[in-house]
Amino acid sequence: FISIVVLLAFSFSLQAAEKGIARAKGESSSDSGSRIALVIGNASYASAPLRNPINDVRSIASALKKVGFQVTKVENASLQSMDDAVRRFGQKARKSDVALVYYSGHGLQLKGSNYLQPIGADIRREQDIRFKAYNSDQILAELEDGSQRVNIVILDACRNNPLSRSFRSASKGLAQPRYQPPVGTIIAFSTAPGTVAYDGKGENSPYTSELYNAILEPGLKIEDVFK
């Protein structure tokens, strides 16, 4: 039903990450160290708008707050807004125990690199993608400098994007990251590389709906959240 690809960086310690998302029953947020999250949802595209991303980020933000995260939520972000939000989050992440970034919206891959599509991006040529879309490697680069034990990057961005069909070198879905992630990093996609998902018929995308329930399940280990 839901296909997920998870990349664990070398030397990643599951023992340190088992409580990275869900708390055991009776555990307060102060018991689990500093947890911060940045959630971004882009839906209001001029071409091929999406139904679910705004609901997705609001649902995930709500779930994360319930398990002790301090959440920054950004909706319908321009390229500049996405860049500013990730940079500010990267600075905060240096002092955190767990840093989580979640994105819902259009994305595509170009020559093996993954790009998240901002709102208002005027992408007319293949070359525009590099300059007018947000390279997801920048998220990993921001998290690389932190001392946090666990980094989690979740991309629900594999929706069927018409731009992927418009350019010769652009491919559907997202690619396995080429950027070497920081130690202690989990990267999760809503589908396998090179495949696409669709907006769900309900309030949330199918992937986010399952993720929401997994986050709120008490005592669930992090490796089980992404199964």
For the regions a language model picked out, list residue spans one by one.
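Active-site-proximal C-terminal subdomain of hydrolase catalytic domains
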Residues: 41, 53, 74, 148-227
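Short secondary-structure boundary/capping segments
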Residues: 29, 143-144, 177-179
